[in-house]
Structure formats: C-alpha cells, structure tokens
Amino acid sequence: MDVFMKGLSKAKEGVVAAAEKTKQGVAEAAGKTKEGVLYVGSRTKEGVVHGVTTVAEKTKEQVSNVGGAVVTGVTAVAQKTVEGAGNIAAATGLVKKDQLAKQNEEGFLQEGMVNNTGAAVDPDNEAYEMPPEEEYQDYEPEA
C-alpha cells in the first residue's frame, strides 16, 4: 500500500508542477507523472507492468503534444493517468477501491476539479487544436 501511495504522490507532484508553471512545467510534469506511474507499475504484478508503462508513455506523448498550451489540459491528462494507475492497482488487488476514495478525500485531485478548488473542468476538453496542414509553409534560409 505504501508503494502505491508513494507512486501516486509522485504523480500528484507532476500535476502540481504543471499547474504552477507553463511550458517548462509541462515537461517537468510529464517526467514526474511518468516516474510516479512507473514506480507503481514496477511494484505491481508482472502482467500489469506493461500496461502501466504504456499509460505512462501515452501521457508523456500527450503532454509533449500540448507544449505551451493551457495548463488545464495538462492537468486533466496527468489526472487521468493517476486515475488509470489507481484502477490498475485496484484491479490487481494491490489496494481496495475504498482506499483510493479515502486518498482523494485527503488531498488528491478529484476528477473534474482543479486543485480541489471547486472550479469545474472538462477532463475530455481538448485545450489545443492543430492547424490544417495547408497553413504550414516550408522555410528555406537565404544563402
């Protein structure tokens, strides 16, 4: 149980770092979130490790795609990763779901809320849009 909580704590640090910083925080948050999820994954049953590693990699990819975009989107991505790791741990019997709910009451971010302030967010909200490819131009420096 302590291992799982330590992993979630590291992932939470990543979420907090993203909320406090902009572009620099995004990269740091991705690393810390991945570190926390991998920590949990390395301590769970062998068959689950691959799944947790995949979740961590996808989170890192999503955060990289966000770049300097709105931090709320990054927070939602990181929060979903933490929730996914919790669900994996609960499914393997590492922790009980009621223990996860208790941790949420003690300070972990609630789904759909920003830093437990009561400000609602849409976790499925795409905080950025990629422009159509025809808007891109190749740049060739002058010689």
Swiss-Prot record:
Domain of life according to the entry: Eukaryota
PTM annotation, UniProt: Acetylation at Met-1 seems to be important for proper folding and native oligomeric structure.
Residue ranges of coiled coil: none
Residues where N-acetylmethionine is found: 1
UniProt note on tissues of expression: Brain.
Keyword Repressor applies: no
Region (Disordered): 116-143
Cellular component, GO, one term: actin cytoskeleton
Pfam assignment, any one: Synuclein
Protein name: Alpha-synuclein
Sequence repeat placement: 20-30, 31-41, 42-56, 57-67
Role, per record: May be involved in the regulation of dopamine release and transport. May be involved in neuronal plasticity.
GO BP annotation list: adult locomotory behavior; cellular response to copper ion; cellular response to oxidative stress; dopamine biosynthetic process; excitatory postsynaptic potential; fatty acid metabolic process; long-term synaptic potentiation; microglial cell activation
Keyword field contains Metal-binding: yes
Region ranges (4 X 11 AA tandem repeats of [EGS]-K-T-K-[EQ]-[GQ]-V-X(4)): 20-67
Compositionally biased spans, kind Acidic residues: 123-143
Compartment(s): Cytoplasm, Cytosol; Membrane; Nucleus; Synapse
Main location: cytoplasm
Gene name of this polypeptide: SNCA
Keyword tags: Acetylation, Copper, Cytoplasm, Membrane, Metal-binding, Nucleus, Repeat, Secreted, Synapse
InterPro entries on file: Synuclein, Synuclein_alpha
Paired cysteines (S-S): none
Species in which this protein is naturally found: Serinus canaria
